[in-house]
Amino acid sequence: MNSTDVTKGFTEQFGKQAEHTFFAPGRINLIGEHTDYNGGHVFPCAISLGTYAAVGTNEDNAFRLYSANFPKVGIIDIPFSDLFQDKRGLWTDYFQGMARVMKTAGANFTHGLNVYINGNLPDGAGLSSSASLEMLVGTILNSLFDGGFEPLELVQFGVKVENDYIGVNSGVMDQFAIEMGRANQATLLDTNTMKYEYLPVEMGDNVIVIMNTNKRRELADSKYNERRSECEKALAMLQKGIEVKSLGQLSEDEFDENTYLIYDPILIKRARHAVFENQRTLKASKALQDGDLKTFGKLVSASGVSLAFDYEVTGIELDTLVTNALKQRGVLGARMTGAGFGGCAIAIVNSADVEDFIDNVGKAYREKIGYDAHFYVADIADGAKQLN
């Protein structure tokens, strides 16, 4: 898929030529899962799979929206006068949410837009299709209406849409990775301070393979909110005995010394993941900088174990992929990525072994789960941008 596909689709739907094209990537997180709302570090990168848009003007004072990913929905009109109406339960809620947040922040929509959208991110796969759409919309509206918003402002607008409009208490990682991504680099982001640095992803003879369970993350939103609530409860218990603003501020030793303040075994497990995952992320980013891929792979795998047993956000599909991935020749590490409860896992695989890896893991998954997983070699890409 490329911009030509959406310009053709635009003409078919709206009967005229598109004037602009845009792209926003998806993302994978190398390590640092469920740490972004706990004041910890994350280490994501944008990928070449993503969401495209072709855009043209109209004189109707409305956004006229079509997505090739939801063809049965057809064209949806959102008049400017309806921007602050309730959400409709459609994909257009993300467009409407971004538009209303930007309008509140001072954006001036001087004319209508026809927008044709098509993406190649599998829906519900945990590669951040919703954040990709939010950053795509933010880039479109900021570019075409001279909004003047900085990239980090668009990131915060996207988080606000998720939290206040869609109803998912997500952190900042997805929107940040998609808006701020750079080709062949991952971003080490301290979500507590929003300080970040770009680090080259140099894998030598290895590649990152994305493994899609093809199980939609149907429970992810409710369980995501539940995990965040559990971490907040654990933090509140710790704060009764020590001065700490977020779980991400604690070292492993500091956490171990103060677990007596958390008198719930489930909450201890949740908080332990947040604390230890943050430290793993710092160690992993340093290992990658040092070219120590063996250590990097071990830390990635350790993250997966913690997500399965302390945070409990995997499930049989992800566990089957990761367990079988780690049995294969040429694999340095593997774990789930994203919110969990379905979606995707990643593996670091020697490029010479990728074909056998996909065959073997795919066969084992089919035999265990009853349907196919899909595999993609990740291409680390730039963030959201206008293409023409």
Curated annotation (Swiss-Prot):
One of its GO terms (cellular component) is cytosol. InterPro entries: Galactokinase, Galactokinase_bac, Galactokinase_CS, GalKase_N, GHMP_kinase_C_dom, GHMP_kinase_C_sf, GHMP_kinase_N_dom, GHMP_knse_ATP-bd_CS. Its main location: cytoplasm. ATP binds at residues 67, 124-130. Belongs to the GHMP kinase family. GalK subfamily. Catalyzes the transfer of the gamma-phosphate of ATP to D-galactose to form alpha-D-galactose-1-phosphate (Gal-1-P). This is Galactokinase. It comes from Lacticaseibacillus casei (strain BL23) (Lactobacillus casei). The lineage of its organism: Bacteria, Bacillati, Bacillota, Bacilli, Lactobacillales.
